[in-house]
From Swiss-Prot:
Residues 18-367 are annotated as: Catalytic. Its EC number is 3.2.1.4. Rate of hydrolysis of cellulo-oligosaccharides increased with increasing chain length from cellotriose to cellopentaose. The lineage of its organism: Eukaryota, Fungi, Fungi incertae sedis, Chytridiomycota, Chytridiomycota incertae sedis. It is an enzyme of class 3 (hydrolase). The keyword tRNA-binding does not apply. GO terms for biological process: glucan catabolic process. GO terms for molecular function: beta-glucosidase activity; cellulase activity. It catalyses: Endohydrolysis of (1->4)-beta-D-glucosidic linkages in cellulose, lichenin and cereal beta-D-glucans. Belongs to the glycosyl hydrolase 5 (cellulase A) family. Keywords: Glycosidase, Hydrolase, Repeat, Signal. This is Endoglucanase B. Coiled coil: none annotated.
Amino acid sequence: MKFLNTFSLLSLAIIGSKAMKNISSKELVKDLTIGWSLGNTLDATCFETLDYNKNQIASETCWGNVKTTQELYYKLSDLGFNTFRIPTTWSGHFGNAPDYKINDQWMKRVHEIVDYAINTGGYAILNIHHETWNHAFQKNLESAKKILVAIWKQIAAEFADYDEHLIFEGMNEPRKVGDPAEWNGGDYEGWNFVNEMNDLFVKTIRATGGNNALRHLMIPTYAACINDGAINNFKFPSGDDKVIVSLHSYSPYNFALNNGAGAISNFYDGSEIDWAMNTINSKFISRGIPVIIGEFGAMNRNNEDDRERWAEYYIKKATSIGVPCVIWDNGYFEGEGERFGLINRSTLQVVYPKLVNGLIKGLGNSIKTRTTIRRTTTTTTSQSQPTNNDSCFSVNLGYSCCNGCEVEYTDSDGEWGVENGNWCGIKSSCSNTSRICWSEKLGYPCCQNTSSVVYTDNDGKWGVENGNWCGIY
């Protein structure tokens, strides 16, 4: 069993029990901090250059990204991300009607990557992405319904025993591709298509039973856009408190997404972000409907300082209304296309640390850190004196000190261990090197004097000293 978890002052839940918490989506989203999207990877399609019959999983790297690894997700978790969207294109990976059987190789690979995310103790969002069969035209509706039901039944069965840390997202940006209404908020034809598909998706997952009866589900507006037409004609299912609205917002457009005339590299006006958040709040949040912004971002224009300010502003606004956000990372850093890369997936180097810093700063007092537990063994040094002495940091968090220096598991910074099946704090005497404050790699100083810390977050790892956030170590 993998022991992977989040420390808090209130609870300690071990992933692996598969017990499904019966909580509303309004409660669930409170535990989501910053999200990261595995863009241009499992959603990549290369029908003209790949022989899908010979190799079903080659498409993962056919748009230029490297094979996804567990270490990538551990790195992201260490940086503060706890929500991981996994965009997935199923076309090319399933058979003909009427079964539309998903290829076993492909399902296995998708399952592996979902586990990479879950293994951090965070949340995974699995979806249906760059499909052509669900373009939102009436002529496609009946065939699209059949495929949607078949694909989601198989996905639901594959992950039937997964708990609330796995979220299903029915569709990605369903819209009338190639039509004048494609990105303009839709029309009656498009709205009806999306509403019927959303309703069918929810009913399909619920009918599979087991944990899926309580599965948290995300459904989009038309094109997942924040537009009066799309939102006013969106139908949210009644009587189901485990459904979340999925929205995308690359705002301000000219700063964040526009790659042509009118594009700007300076962030000086947050009015578009304000409008988006005010709309979300008035249309959904104020009515008790939870929202996740499943995609947002600002492409690289050699303007990292501006993107840092933008990220802090964006996340601060979203956090103020209780909306978690998932940044889009397509793995591209240079060139003429969309440059939304954040982390080098080969070296695990954060290419734009200031941008990450802005995201974390935007969380403000809502910041929560997640600890990824990995199987290691601490080394007893000549200075080690294993005792029952409880004079270590974990006592203040409600956990005893580890009796010895050799424990079954430690977290990534070596501060927490598992001993006799229980979490415990590892004493500083178990290391002959000075402890390095983990917050420095996120751009925050160490707290200099814990007695002067005037505020701590709920897991006691972050503090406020002299008006500034600092890491407690």
